[in-house]
Amino acid sequence: ANAQNCTLVSGMCHSLSAIFRYSLNMTDELSTMQNEMGHVRNYLYVMDVRNGATITYDYQIDSETLQDRLPRICLQPVVENAISHGLRNTRRKDKKLLIRSEHIGDNLVVTIADNGIGMDAQAMNELLEKNDRKRVESGVSIGILNVNARLKKIFGEQYGIHIESQAGEGTTVTITVPAIAEKNENSESENNGG
């Protein structure tokens, strides 16, 4: 038991320090899919230690997308919402979270889907479409609305987040951005992700 606690504490320290390092590194507003996934995996490890490993994760990350550019910390808030609002409140025993990345045409499409309680997707999509930047910039809006506003600001109004959901079945959040690979293919991964 003691050895297990040491491993757990060591893993938790590693993940937390990686999360802080990644979050505080503001040298570039863009990162890569690989680094974003490293950040998400560290976050999910911390959540598993905190809440117990009650969720099954399915990562379907196309290796062709790993060097594609994304705004820093754009996947983790969506994953956090899926856990906090979708999966935490469901009574199902088979909680699942899917994270998929793929190229569709000239775009990088990232899908984050849960089998949680679902939500009012129409109302949320209306808020996303409205893209109230003043609300986001004032700090009133955080999470998915903030991520959507950043995606639209960086890549254009045609990009961003779309949500589909069914009550009792789960929610699927789709992030669409242009597929732009990082110029330096040999870039060092910040988070050991991928």
Enumerate the language-model features and the residues they cover.
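Two-component histidine phosphotransfer core
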Residues: 1-164, 170-174
